[in-house]
C-alpha cells in the first residue's frame, strides 16, 4: 500500500541521513 511504501521510504531516508 501507499502507507507502507511511504514508511519504508521514510525509514530509508532516516537511515541515509544517519550514515552520512
Swiss-Prot record:
Ranges where the record places region Plays an important role in the hemolytic activity: 3-12
Subcellular location: Secreted; Nematocyst; Target cell membrane
GO biological process annotation, one example: monoatomic ion transport
Molecular function, one GO term: toxin activity
Keywords, comma-separated and alphabetical: Cytolysis, Ion transport, Membrane, Nematocyst, Secreted, Target cell membrane, Target membrane, Toxin, Transmembrane, Transport
UniProt main location, coarse: secreted
Source domain of life: Eukaryota
Cellular-component GO terms for this entry: extracellular region; membrane; nematocyst; other organism cell membrane
Region named N-terminal region: 11-20
Coiled coil: none
Keyword field contains tRNA processing: no
Function: Pore-forming protein that forms cations-selective hydrophilic pores of around 1 nm and causes cardiac stimulation and cytolysis. Pore formation is a multi-step process that involves specific recognition of membrane sphingomyelin (but neither cholesterol nor phosphatidylcholine) using aromatic rich region and adjacent phosphocholine (POC) binding site, firm binding to the membrane (mainly driven by hydrophobic interactions) accompanied by the transfer of the N-terminal region to the lipid-water interface and finally pore formation after oligomerization of monomers.
Subunit architecture: Octamer or nonamer in membranes. Monomer in the soluble state.
Record-stated family: Belongs to the actinoporin family. Sea anemone subfamily.
Free-text domain note: Composed of a long N-terminal alpha-helix and a core region rich in beta-sheet structures. Before the pore formation, the alpha-helix binds the lipid membrane, partitions into the lipid-water interface and stabilizes the monomeric molecule on the membrane. Finally, it traverses the bilayer, thus forming the transmembrane pore.
Name used for this protein in its record: Equinatoxin-3
